[in-house]
Curated annotation (Swiss-Prot):
GO terms for molecular function: transferase activity; transferase activity, transferring alkyl or aryl (other than methyl) groups. Involved in the biosynthesis of branched-chain polyamines, which support the growth of thermophiles under high-temperature conditions. Catalyzes the sequential condensation of spermidine with the aminopropyl groups of decarboxylated S-adenosylmethionines to produce N(4)-bis(aminopropyl)spermidine via N(4)-aminopropylspermidine. This is N(4)-bis(aminopropyl)spermidine synthase. Keywords: Cytoplasm, Polyamine biosynthesis, Transferase. It is found in: Cytoplasm. One of its GO terms (biological process) is polyamine biosynthetic process. It comes from Methanocaldococcus jannaschii (strain ATCC 43067 / DSM 2661 / JAL-1 / JCM 10045 / NBRC 100440). One of its GO terms (cellular component) is cytoplasm. Belongs to the branched-chain polyamine synthase family. It catalyses: 2 S-adenosyl 3-(methylsulfanyl)propylamine + spermidine = N(4)-bis(aminopropyl)spermidine + 2 S-methyl-5'-thioadenosine + 2 H(+).
Length: 350
């Protein structure tokens, strides 16, 4: 194992541990599909690709239509006592911990409306979750007392959470901020069709600060930032600066597919030390992203050892809920970065 670890460290920019390699080996015991190996191992995709290449060099796996152990590889995993991944998840809620029993009508109406939604745009690192995930977000936020009669800010709305919020009739007011005019226009059209008046929709690149009128104006925000430290600080910082004060809430997703645990630690330090907020919830694989259709344009495709489009959902993120306290503060400065907003060594969907 030590030899493999050293070879991966020499090859990869991403922090790697023996546990990283064990996770990938365990995932390969479960599936030969590269995308599912990334999903099950919960290691950043570029690192998984590097590990698999080293395993191939060492004669432990063979790569053809899938990734499979050689005889030498099978002996190796037996000698280290590595078993297959056990992915036992509740079949009712898919591990989210919320019930959609009282939200079935909302779910069906949402599905119908978003059939004609704009498709994800690679330029903006877009991707959207399943309708069940979007409505589960509504259920989660409502269960925490963060929606009813509240002013809600949506920072980036690939998932059309604002439409689900309108259909729920729970918030007092909704404000949507997005860089993509296609999404902005679609949300406006739906608001007109629903005759929903309590919504504002603005086009803004979040590298720039929010308009001053949105400072300390909201009870709740939700966002789904790109997963560079720059982007996390910017998107979440903007959300915190828009909250009215203490004991207000923010929601966002962070993956293990594009963020190592080292990056998670940096993100959590930013949340706790810089923003002075409390992390109240982290729900594993809450968000399931529909395969976005531009896979062949991404870094993930270039790195994938098997050039085969994913057949199942593999890209998932953990849902974070944070809450502000007396000394919490956000981030309001303009960010002067380009591609670094979307890309770092662990990125793969850009």
């Amino acid at each position: 194992m030590e030899r493999i670890l050293e070879k991966v460290r020499a090859k990869s920019e991403i922090p790697v541990y023996d546990k990283s390699i064990e996770n990938v080996l365990s995932a390969i015991l479960t599936t030969n599909d590269f995308w599912k190996i990334v999903d099950l191992s919960e290691e950043p995709l570029p690192l998984v690709a590097d590990i698999i290449r080293i395993l191939e060099e060492e004669g432990l796996v063979k790569i053809s239509n899938g990734i499979e152990f050689t005889e030498k590889g099978n002996e190796f995993i037996k000698s280290y006592g590595i078993g297959a991944k056990d992915n036992s998840v509740c079949e009712c809620c898919e591990g989210r911990g919320v019930s959609l029993k009282n939200y079935q009508d909302l779910l069906e109406r949402f599905k119908e409306i978003v059939k004609n939604r704009p498709m994800p745009k690679h330029e903006y690192d877009q991707g959207f979750v399943t309708p069940e995930c979007t409505i589960s977000r509504i259920a989660l936020m409502n269960s925490r007392g963060d929606l009813f009669n509240k002013d809600v800010l949506v920072l980036g709305d690939d998932d059309l959470t604002s439409i689900a919020l309108m259909l729920s009739n729970l918030p007092k007011k909704i404000v949507v901020v997005d860089i993509d005019d296609r999404l902005i226009n679609f949300i406006k059209e739906v608001a007109e069709q629903l005759n929903y008046k309590n919504i504002e929709v603005i086009t803004l690149d979040l590298r720039k600060p929010l308009p001053e009128k949105y400072s300390r104006a909201f009870d709740t925000f939700i966002t789904d930032p790109p997963e560079t430290v720059y982007a996390v600080k910017t998107f979440i910082g903007r959300g915190i600066s828009a909250l009215k004060g203490e004991r207000r809430a923010g929601y966002f997703g962070i993956t293990r597919r594009e963020s190592s645990l080292d990056k998670w630690r940096e993100i959590q330090r930013t949340l706790i030390n810089d923003f002075n907020v409390v992390i109240t919830d982290i729900i594993r694989n809450f968000n399931h992203y529909v395969n976005w259709g531009y896979e062949e344009e991404t870094r993930a495709w270039k790195l994938a050892p098997v050039k085969k489009k994913p057949e199942d959902i593999w890209y998932k993120s953990y849902m974070f809920r944070i809450e502000t306290l007396k000394d919490s503060r956000g981030f309001e400065e303009e960010v002067d970065v380009g591609d670094e907003l979307y890309n770092d060594a662990e990125s793969s969907t850009t």
